[in-house]
Amino acid sequence: MRTPLAAGLAALALLAAGCGGTGAEGGTAGGGTFTYALPADPGVLDPAMGVLNVTNTTLSLAYDTLVGIDAQGEIVPALAERWTVEPDKVTFTLRKDATCSDGAPVTPSDVAASVNHITDPDTKSPIYGVLIPTGMKAEADDAAGTVTLSMPKPFSFILETGRAIFVVCGKGVEDRSILARSTSGSGAYRLTEAVPGDHYTFKVRREYAWGAPGTSIKDAPETVVLKIVPNEQTAANLLVSGALNGITLYGPDRTRVEAAPGVTKTITPVANGQFFYHQGEDRPTHDPAVRKALTQAVDLKELAGIASSGTGKPPTGLVLHPRPCQGDTVTGHVPAHDPAAAAAALDAAGWKPGPDGVRVKDGKRLTLRYLYATTRGAGVQAAAEYLATAWGAIGAEVKLNGAIDTKLSESLNTTQDWDVVWLPIGVTLPSQLVGFLSGPAAPKGANFAHLSNKQYQSLVDEASQVPAAEGCDKWLQAESALFEAADMVPVVETTVLEAAKGATYEMVAGMFVTTSIRLTQGAE
């Protein structure tokens, strides 16, 4: 089975988030209630169907993964206490003390069932083929206390895949229908009340002792409430007033929250903003000379400030922090800003100015249909207008097309009625991008921009044959090859503000480090 493009793109754009959290001011106090704002309802709570970041934030309270990741990008134990890795498989030895929220032990068979349910074509899981690689199988040995994940051929990040699997245990293994509105996991908290559109309440499991190394649930809050607050201004007001303990802010309310007394904060990278050129044979951007000229026409530093409303950072790669492969794949690999050189390059490519200033070649105008999501905020809208002006200055005719997410996915997957698209991406492993940046083109495949970069594919093929650490140089070079060919243009690393009042907590890749949640002294 191949993941449908629309679902896969949703996963790329919405699933991942970076590391973040807030430091404590003063001591901490056990018990009490920690209240955190979610910007939307998490929807169906079955881990196999969780594609939204808010869903996975919610699930992270109640479920564990096989392994975790620390702030430096290193894999650390979770349900698995140790592992052995081969090019095409990894065998995990599970802890013996982990139990499910209903008291049942967590077994290798539970892990295997979680994986094989995701990979079952009948499940139609949107994370299969993106977070869980196509072809993965799981086999349990309950007597030995091990579970083996295998692939039909070598796969670099087979160990790292273990951090993407929320393990269902206990009653949820036998009856997955209960997972739509309840939880059945081994996490530090269990769901006790779900009021869709309003709040989700979790109670601590004091017996929890199998979290990240060196952590404890002893002083954790008795209750965690995730409150649905769609409006950021409202969420900011609630935090400042003390009605909330934690929020994540994307927009202009960040400034006043940062300045509010008693608020601790962390700036966290959560996604990359970039645009892609459609390389179909009938498109002007099929020609690499045109793509590079259009890129040269843009002051990317200025565009980054516009798109992020001044809160972004320079991009250094496609994978979110903490990265399994450390390095800057962007600097020195993107065509530099030079409008005069851009105009000259278009002249050389045969695109000559017409009577109205729009360039023409073989009777065809240099028209670019620019597609972007209207749900990404005012900065992305302003960025679209900036690009239209910059490209208009060198003789391109730009038609802006703002669309909601579902329409954008339809355009990418089916109608292909675009020439340039602004598409945020958030992935935790470089392998999660391969199907979207190479291979069969849409609508038959997931390669929505019709990319055909032989250097990228060759480097990916080499990197995929060896474990992640050995292949990192090749993975990094593969990203740079995309930028050098102007297949896609990285613009900005988008950030959010993680803010807390009366509490402290940590998040990694959009998921709670549950044993880090604490109420500070004096909190209610």
PLM segments and residue spans:
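Surface-exposed binding/hinge segments that line
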Residues: 84, 89, 127-172, 193-195
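Structural transition elements
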Residues: 314-355, 375-381
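N-terminal lobe/hinge region of extracytoplasmic solute-binding protein
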Residues: 37-87, 116, 184
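Aromatic- and charge-enriched surface segment that lines or borders ligand/interaction sites
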Residues: 81-124, 145-148, 284-286
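Detector for C-terminal structural segments
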Residues: 28-29, 195-198, 298-329, 378-388, ...
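Ligand-site clamp/hinge motif
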Residues: 208-257, 385, 397
